[in-house]
Amino acid sequence: MKDLLDIMQSPTSNGNHEFDSIQITLASPDVIKSWSHGEVKKPETINYRTFKPERDGLFCAKIFGPVKDFECLCGKYKRRKFQGVICEKCGVEVTTAKVRRDRMGHIDLASPVAHIWFLKSLPSRIGLLLDMTLRDIERVLYFESYIVTEPGLTSLEKYQLLDDEDYYKALEEFGDEFTAKMGAEAVQDLLKDIDLDLEIDELREAIPQTGSETKLKKMSKRLKLLEAFRNSNNKPEWMVMNILPVLPPDLRPLVPLEGGRFATSDLNDLYRRVINRNNRLKRLLELSAPDIIVRNEKRMLQESVDALLDNGRRGRAITGSNKRPLKSLADMIKGKQGRFRQNLLGKRVDYSGRSVIVVGPTLRLHQCGLPKKMALELFKPFTYNKLLSHGLATTIKAAKKMVEREEPQVWDMLAMVIREHPVLLNRAPTLHRLGLQAFEPVLIEGKAIQLHPLVCTAFNADFDGDQMAVHVPLTLEAQLESRALMMSTNNILSPANGEPIIVPSQDVVLGLYYISRSSVNAKGEGMIFATVNEALRAIGSNDLHVNAKIKVRVTETHIDDDGNRTKETSIKDTVAGRLLIWNIMPVGMSFDECNEEMTKKNISKLINSCYRKVGVKESVMFADQLMYLGFAQATLSGVSIGIDDMVIPPLKKQIIEVAEAEVREIEDQFEQGFVTAGERYNKVVDIWSRTNDKVAKAMMDNLATDKIINAKGEEEEQKSFNSIFIMSDSGARGSAAQIRQLAGMRGLMAKPDGSIIETPIKANFREGLTVLQYFISTHGARKGLADTALKTANSGYLTRRLVDVAQDLVITSDDCGTEQGLLMKPHIQGGEIIEKLGELVLGRVTARDVTYNDDAEKILIPAGTLIDEHWVKVLDNNAIDDIWARSVITCEIEHGVCSQCYGRDLARGHKVNIGESVGVMAAQSIGEPGTQLTMRTFHVGGAASSASVDNSISVRSAGQAHFENMKTVQHTDGHLVIVSRSAEIALTDELGRERERYKVPYGSSVLIKDEEQVEGGQTIAKWDPHTHPIITEFAGTARFSEITDGLTATVKVDDATGMSSFEILATRDRSSSAKDLRPAIILNTDEGKEVIYFLPAETIIRVSDGEKVAAGSILGRVPQASSGTKDITGGLPRVADLFEARRPKDHAIMAEMSGVVSFGKETKGKNRFIITNEDGEIHEELIPKWRQINVFENETVARGEVIADGPQNPHDILRLKGQTALADYIVNEVQDVYRLQGVKINDKHIEVIIRQMLRKVEITDGGDSNHFKGDQVEYADIKALNAKLEAEDKFPVQFERQLLGITKASLATESFISAASFQETTRVLTAAAVTGKVDELRGLKENVVVGRLIPAGTGLAYHKARKEKAEQKLQDKDLNAAFDMSATTDSKDFASFDEAFAQELNQGNH
């Protein structure tokens, strides 16, 4: 293997393979000439009679090299001995035919041609340099107008466009004092004339003076481009070509088909076109043809070169004979079928095969069954080797013959070869890393691959015709990696959430569940056994039924943290069958873990606890044994489905009759006009969905229990042994919803647009459906299938974007030493805790010391501790509410992440290793469940939304209440009224652990005091959900200002009470004279101050003029528009929106700074909202009038507080509240979507993606750097730059963190290779070429593209070693230089030499 690597690394004919970076630049005419081996002068390709390439044509052997190895075209020189000879007759060099793949030619263009990429790829680089519009440049290039290139002493301006008429006029007027040209020639001259240094200096002076934003943007763009040209040594005139390179002929082949036709690459057509036009143009110029003809020919040449480079970018695409657009050079590299994605990132692999999979229930977890035929083919070379080394064959040829005849010895050799040589199995689509795992092959007859049932979950495989691919790791290193890292036994835990993925399902669960269930009056009930073995013997001899309840003496072994073992014996009440499970459990587990009904959840818990307690090896063996036991017992249990198992509940008829009566009643009300059509529909749908639930409940109650006569002859109820119930209850197959359709009623169906059909299907499948019912149900079924197809594509695209943005994130060091982190709190929704603190911080490292609640000096957990299961218990027992934990987002390493900030590797259960590619892992973990998410937008309307309005808070459990952020006033009635916006009430238990937390709206009445003890179920706060109160915080006298009936207000009389009150009119409803009046209540407080409350439109005033009011009184109420039907984006589209950082429509408006609120003069459709802070700074913004503003005049708001409700805008959260708040928001929102589908993903994965979204910053002030306001720069670069500036006592750069969506972030990555292979290839490559960008090959993708080991996992060490070797070389070079210097010195120079040597050494070390 080492020799192989040496061969690969040895210098070959084309120089050394080793390189550290790749640069892309514009090619100058000289460079193109230097690549070329000759000029292509003729459009001919090959002679159709002799099939020999034409001389000077597109396939010319003289230019590009011989067609056959070591043979010239005319046949004078054949064979290897003439290598390097150039034939005198045909001019062909005698060499390998392979050179036709890399020898290029060129075409000398008769007139310059602009490169379409730099012209049309937006922003147009030529346009930006010349500071002209694209439209104008095109008019010049395509010969519509002249452009003045040299105005001389005339009144014309440089860059002025002249049409024919103007040009001839100017000629008459000025003669030849000026120069004006057209075509690419003119553009080339103008580009040549640009003095980069001068332009740059002018712009640098002009930029600080500009006031307008748009001008500033344009100027800084232009300046950037000019500097890029200056720094990259690209010359602007190179964007116009005088010489066109020709691709080597073997990369644009011409293949003869039968029948004398040829299949050819489209490029040949395109080149032929260019050559024809070029030759014609040369002839016309020699003949000095009329200007108009030459012009037309030049234009056609420009168009043909455009088509060759990028067909269809300008005008209509040129089509071939079959009406299809021809594939140009640009099309070759972009898109899914382009070079990047088809050939560089997705190669096909040798030594592989694929076949159908079948189940292998007798295999061990690390094995797979490989068909003999397949194994023989895959391991052929290895088998030849064994045959030779064992002397069974003398030559390779003989061995080959033996293998072809399939002689008996061959199989023995194959078995030896295969022994302990793992193979990789892969099932497409490979959505996460567990879709490719290593197994040891076991030779089997037949043609199908056998797969172990427990790995099906990871592969998402089933046996209904799925196929899988087999790959053979050839080298020793590859075999080692397969065994150590990819073996199925080393991948027990899922990388997404750290829980076991090797969990039995379906039949196995059914078998285990059956034997762990107890049954009354089973054979052997009540027996008592001295040992487990006795009981097992009784089961074996049929004296004891597996479902019988018995007592047995059990000996358990406990292992403590230090590995000490203690034994404990006790008598347990159990079910006989559970002893079968106990019998295979590893030593160190407790009996209670298997002494319960083995549902799928419990089995998963059992395997998880086994892994944590006794490690990988035991767990794998246990999982295998569980599977064998489950399969055997499922067979013995005889569970099967009969039609009588679907028991229809006797109550069903009665329940449905009641519902029908209710529906009739509503129909009557509708006919009499008491309810609207919408209300009727909502109520009917409501009734039927309630009815469906009632039927389902009756059915489940009926199914779930059996009545049975026990040993004493009494009737007692027990859990049912109905087959369908057993399957559903164990989690093996089917759900309550499916059983409901079999034996309950099918219920309401949806139309394809998602709306519900109000006629339900009252029948179930057992009763059978009528034609109409069947017809209704086809809607839903078909929509389901269509949805699935759509979902798969969308989910795949999301995964691709995620992988692309995160691919270069790798663990690069052990500790970055940061003290930053995120503050972790339990996740709370609707008052209850969904995720405990322990679950959130498990596997993370503490960023700061965790101290005791009652004593902040005493340290409970020191900073830098990895929190494992033991520490989680400590946290729970000490009632810790929040922890500062390290996070990927706050990691301070320049490239990659450090292992302390990442914490535990979820798939291995220990601290993450250096080199683990956490980025790709995160992307896969988030993308893989994507297909399980829904695609739909939820319409919450009518009955559903009206019920969900809360108007009070009742606590669930007893505890002590704590008020947070709460500002209250005491009302005269004694209760407190809240006058702050973000008030919360938290509830803690007797240990001080937070149990519940509630947000309390503004204006609520709080019915308890701070720190008061409350009972479970007690109401602690209430409010009116339909109005928004205006509350006074002071007592005093109310006085009306500008509130006049008919002008700014109207009098409303309440029908029920007969009381009248004022209602403020909206500005649009007032007469013109009253438009500018601002109705308000002025409160003269008892302290003698004046407080003004401005009243928004539609306020209903609750006090009268001159009335005395108490503190906490309500002055007025603003009705809340009931939020009708809102569409909630759910599922996959929601996740995509969050990661793309899209700004939601009508998003929440947040306070830009802390201060006091006031309202300025209104405009036509907007309110002027003003915040004044303590220093008197003012922030103004205009808010549309239809937005409901939550705050009133003179209220104090904090920065980032919500002023107008709506969906949150992540960019605002980042700007106003910082990155911790942003991380919390995105993590929680994404998790809510996944949680709804019951998918568990660790928060760390989402944080990894957020880190990548926060890579860039926007500069707000360039300081003493050469950056400008508005530049987008990498965060890491700016940090390094600022450190440097501060060290030199200069002004650092001021910047704001930016949040980029994942697509934008992928395209903005430092590596142009990675960006180009993702999307918008043309744009990325154009931008990179102009700036002469260097790709440092840091990420995974770039390295795959150039064909190196990736800098992750085992490849990271290889790259580190390479780097160290390079640095060593540099140091040696410096030393040698120092010694060379000493050779030329005199003895008296020795002192100075020593200094020089020391300096050299120091430089070398840096």
Swiss-Prot record:
DNA-dependent RNA polymerase catalyzes the transcription of DNA into RNA using the four ribonucleoside triphosphates as substrates. Mg(2+) binds at residues 462, 464, 466. Zn(2+) 1 binds at residues 72, 74, 87, 90. The keyword Metal-binding applies. Zn(2+) 2 binds at residues 816, 891, 898, 901. Its cofactor is Mg(2+); Zn(2+). The RNAP catalytic core consists of 2 alpha, 1 beta, 1 beta' and 1 omega subunit. When a sigma factor is associated with the core the holoenzyme is formed, which can initiate transcription. Its EC number is 2.7.7.6. One of its GO terms (cellular component) is DNA-directed RNA polymerase complex. The keyword Metal-binding applies. This is DNA-directed RNA polymerase subunit beta'. It comes from Psychrobacter arcticus (strain DSM 17307 / VKM B-2377 / 273-4). Binds 1 Mg(2+) ion per subunit. Binds 2 Zn(2+) ions per subunit. One of its GO terms (biological process) is DNA-templated transcription. Pfam families: RNA_pol_Rpb1_1 (PF04997), RNA_pol_Rpb1_2 (PF00623), RNA_pol_Rpb1_3 (PF04983), RNA_pol_Rpb1_4 (PF05000), RNA_pol_Rpb1_5 (PF04998). Coiled coil: none annotated. InterPro entries: DNA-dir_RpoC_beta_prime, DNA-dir_RpoC_beta_prime_bact, RNA_pol_asu, RNA_pol_N, RNA_pol_Rpb1_1, RNA_pol_Rpb1_3, RNA_pol_Rpb1_3_sf, RNA_pol_Rpb1_4. Belongs to the RNA polymerase beta' chain family.
